[in-house]
Each structure stands twice: as C-alpha cells, then as structure tokens.
Amino acid sequence: MVLSIAATIPVVQFASLGYMLECSARVARGDRLKDCFPGVALAGNMFRCALAMLLTWLPIWLITDWAYSSELIQPSSNAALSLRIVARILSLLWVLWVVWAIASGGRWRNFLVPRPIRFLRAILSKAFWLDIEDQWWSFLNRLELWHLIKLGFQASLGAWIWLAIPALLILISLGAAPEVKSDQQGGLALLGLLGALLMTRAIQYLPTLQTTMALQKSIADKTDRRWLYGILDRTVARGVFRKVPITYSIANILFLALALPLYFLRIESIPSELWFLLSILFVLWMFPAKLVIGWMIRRSRNKTNDAWWPLRWIAWIAQVAAIGIYVGFLYLGKFALWEGGASLFFQHAFLPPVPFFVR
C-alpha cells in the first residue's frame, strides 16, 4: 500500500523502485527473511495512524457537511454561522489531537480514548513540541527516503541507457516504413531487426544488473563514488548465468511473465486520481518479480564453479525465446498502448511501478 502511494508521487516514485531493489539485494545477500523487508513495522504503524486519522475525522467531516448544507439552505443564518465556527474549532483541535496521539505512540487507544487533561498539558508544554521535532527527524531517518530515491533513480537511469538505442532503432524502423519506397524497406527491416536483437540483449541482463547494482551499493565502502555501481557491466550478469543457467532462465522468464500482463492496463489512460489503484497491481506483480531475481543471485553466490556448458546453451535458448515473445509485445505496444512508441523507453519492468509515465 505504501509503495503504491509512493509510486504516484513524482520523484518519490523512485523510492518505490528503490525499496523493491533493496529487498531483492537483501535476498541476494542471504539475509534472514524478516531482515529482507526493512521498514515493515514502520509501514504498519503508518497505515494504522492513517486509518485512525480517517476514522476520527469522520465526525468532523459530518459537522462540516452540515454547516455547508445549512449555508445553502439558509444563507447567513445564525445556525449556519454557528456550525461553521464549531467545524473550524473542531478541525483545529483534531489536528492537535492527531499530533498528540502520534507522539504518544500512535496506538489505537491513543486515538480513540479521550484524555483531555493529559492532552491539554501536553500541547501547552514546550518539551512536548521539542519531542515532536525529534520524533519527526527520527522518522525521516528511519525511512531512508533519500537512499531509496537515489537507488531507484540510478536503477532507472541504468535501464534507460540500456534501452535507449534499441528502442530508438525500433521506432525509426516502424515510423519510417510507411514513407519509404518498397526497394528501401529491406534496410528498415534490418534496422528493426538490429533494434530487436539489442533489446533482447538488454532485457537478458537488466533484471540481474539492477539487483546486483543494489547489492554492490549496499556493501560498498562509503568512499566508493561510483554512480551506477556496475549496472552497465554485462560481465556481472554473464558470471551469474554461467553458474546457475537454469535458475537464471527460470527467474528471467518469471520476471517477464509477471511484467507482461500489466501492459494490458496501459492500453487506455485513466484519470490520474485513479492511478493509485493501478499502482497497487503494478506493485503486487513486480515486487515478487524483483525478489525472484534476488533469489537467483543468491543461488549463484553459493556456487563456485560454472555449470555444464550444454545446460547453459539449453537455458539460454529458452530464455531468448521468452524474451522474443516479450519484445514482440513491445512492438505491438507501439500501436496499442496509450503512450505509443514511448512505451519502448518506459518499461515498467525496469522502472518505478507506475502505469503511465507520459501524461
């Protein structure tokens, strides 16, 4: 839920991708299961507080609605004025009450059990507001928001570098075909074929390289200033493939199988207010896909020798066949998806879990 909300907020949406890659990297590193999902308890507290805020706001919303209705029925009447004043006072008290409840622990009883004397003493105390400030900065520090945004942006930038040239070649071949003479169609076909082969090559490596980038970043020394942490180094992915070719192919096929159905949700644009609902589905599908890649890398880290070469060839052929189907859908996406040719650049499999990147 939190990842879906983050995915709809510009810039913060990179944190949703960063979190998924961070979890995938922890799986690859071999951490315990409960340590592979940082911030779960914090997210639970945030959800509980949000739900409690919604429930406690309902009575005030009802009074505000009565005040608005009264103003429509009897403009400038004493009853309407009284209701408006009451609604504003209660709204202000509600804000203070919510701040106090969260500072007191954010439990259900803090929101629902009135303690007016303690409440008044708290909000009139200077120490209370200093404690609120400390808790706020501690909360932001626990979120590690900047780290996740930076990780998600670096992974997205690496994906765009890999996808830019293949996508451009494919778009040139498709876009210029109706305007080119028949004797020149062969050149465009070769250009499109080259783009498809380069796209296949990129998709073969990208899922692994994004997770290995997050893994290398998590274990790198603070003095390490590398910006993309090897996401452009295909030898890293090739090394993983040589050790666990069957697992590599299965993981990549599952990754693409989870990403492919989501393209049907990108056929027609919907109001941006409803993007949150689609983002839930994108997170539910792509999060397990990232974790599968982490599991595959974890297996490769436990291997010291390369697999038998016939297994590597069998796994490679199966993987390329699956990627070929995916690339075929990308070709169709140029004509069927809302974003048209831009969908070749903005592939949700490697970017934040957002249904539409072009408004």
Predicted regions and their residues:
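Helix-coil boundary and N-terminal low-complexity module in membrane systems
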Residues: 1-267, 275-359
